[in-house]
UniProtKB/Swiss-Prot annotation:
It comes from Methylobacterium sp. (strain 4-46). This is UDP-N-acetylglucosamine 1-carboxyvinyltransferase. The active site is at C126. The modification 2-(S-cysteinyl)pyruvic acid O-phosphothioketal is found at C126. Cell wall formation. Adds enolpyruvyl to UDP-N-acetylglucosamine.
Length: 429
């Protein structure tokens, strides 16, 4: 199993290109099942989760072809993928494939909407809380699907197609909104999605569906209206920049000091996180084609933060921000409101010398003067990159084990950091 070795202490200097967002690319790829025509997606990151989803789509009979890159992308970053679901041979998504990644469960929506049936294994993947699929299935039932659980599989059917309906989510759910959008796009009549997620990745999916012929209004607000159509066509769409990768590298710069320009990204995708970062004393400047992050002199100030759905502070940046706060001046209180069991990184940060106390959904972080390198173990995707951030500032060497988590969500991480002066290397098993 691969390991990453980091010798801390070097400030980051230079430029980092931001990849396409995995959390946008996955639902966009799944949406290709809604049509028999070709959907071409540009700026798709090269990640383990992308490869896993291509295998799942291939199992259904979807053809895919990698056709090129965007100008400026290197051999290790970015790709353009053409997906054609003109010969879907199977509407079953088996356990051995779905268990590798939670988002693959979303194939239930386009399979059901287009073919009238889907049999999809209950999901696996990330170990963050329970993440139930109840809200996703509720949305499909509201649209007229019959749902059964049989032997660990969700069996969804509709006799005469899905029909437009009002879907009211009791809490904001990104996955539920993705599923509702895809299913409602081919439903008969009008669907109204209340308490819809407003995340940029939801907006990106709706933009692609619109190019395919869907009729969608209100995306980016809590109320989305979808007028169903009888068929969708092909489209070309570029995946939006990864706001979580953007925030991660911004926090790495704040942690180590230095001056880095994050290219190919947009500040409006993560205003809340950048505002919090600025409050710590880090200089954040929006540029026409990116963001400049700079911190010189004194360390960062302690800041309290609470995770919230977009446009609030992203839960996917909570672990990274906690790593930054381990060396802040004073005490920081970090409250996690989205997922339970999302403090698994705390124990590993403590191995580096961090002082963190947990009380339910609250983490209290007392900043320390220095961290010291040690062997640590990644427990999930965001926790693993928080250890990278801490390791970049720790004295001596930090060895991160189980880095396959990183490969699920961060494209060419060692290369991007290394080009900015980080002493980081991968030891391959």
């Amino acid at each position: 199993m691969d390991r990453i070795h980091i010798t801390g202490g070097a400030p980051l200097q230079g430029e980092i290109p931001i990849s396409g967002a995995k959390n946008a690319a996955l639902p966009l790829m799944i949406a290709s099942l809604l049509t028999g025509e070709t959907v071409e997606l540009a700026n798709v990151p090269r990640l383990a989760d992308i490869a896993s989803l291509l295998r799942i789509l291939g199992n259904h009979g979807v053809d895919h072809m990698v056709v090129g890159k965007r100008p400026g992308q290197t051999s290790e970053t970015g790709q353009t993928i053409r997906l054609t679901a003109s010969n879907v041979i199977d509407t079953t998504a088996p356990y051995e494939l779905v268990s590798t990644m939670r988002a693959s469960f979303w194939v239930v929506a386009p399979l059901l909407a287009r073919f009238g049936e889907a049999k999809v294994s209950m999901p696996g993947g990330c170990a963050i809380g329970t993440r139930p699929v109840d809200l996703l299935l509720m949305a499909l039932e509201r649209l007229g699907a019959s749902i059964e659980i049989d032997g660990g599989y969700v069996v969804a059917r509709t006799r005469n197609g899905l029909r437009g309906a009002e879907i009211v989510f009791p809490k904001v759910t990104v996955g539920g909104t993705h599923v509702a959008l895809m299913a409602a796009a081919l439903a008969q009549g009008t669907s109204v999605i209340e308490n819809a997620a407003r995340e940029p990745e939801v907006v990106d999916l709706a933009a692609c569906l619109t190019k395919m012929g869907a009729r969608i209004e209100g995306v980016g607000t809590p109320r989305i209206v979808v007028e169903g159509v009888s068929r969708l066509g092909g489209a070309r769409h570029e995946v939006l920049p990864d706001r979580i990768e953007t925030g991660t590298y911004a926090m790495a710069v704040a942690m180590t000091g230095g001056d880095v320009i994050l290219r190919d990204t947009r500040a409006e995708l993560l205003h809340s996180a950048l505002d919090v970062l600025a409050t710590t004393g880090t200089e954040v400047t929006a540029l026409p084609d990116g963001i400049r992050v700079r911190r010189n002199g004194a360390g960062v100030a302690a800041v309290d933060v609470t995770t919230d759905p977009f446009p609030g502070f992203p839960t996917d940046l909570q672990a990274q921000f906690m790593a930054l706060m381990t060396r802040a001046r004073g005490q920081s209180r970090i409250r996690e409101t989205i997922f339970e069991n999302r403090f698994m990184h705390v124990q590993e940060l403590a191995r580096l010398g961090a002082r963190i106390r947990l009380d339910g959904d609250l983490a209290v972080v007392d900043g320390v003067e220095r961290l010291k390198g040690a062997p640590v173990m990644a427990t999930d995707l965001r926790a693993s990159v928080s250890l990278v951030i801490a390791g970049l500032a720790a004295e001596g060497e930090t060895t991160i084990n189980r880095v396959y988590h990183l490969d699920r969500g961060f494209e060419a991480l060692e290369a991007k950091l290394g080009r900015c002066g980080a002493q980081i290397r991968r030891e391959r098993a």
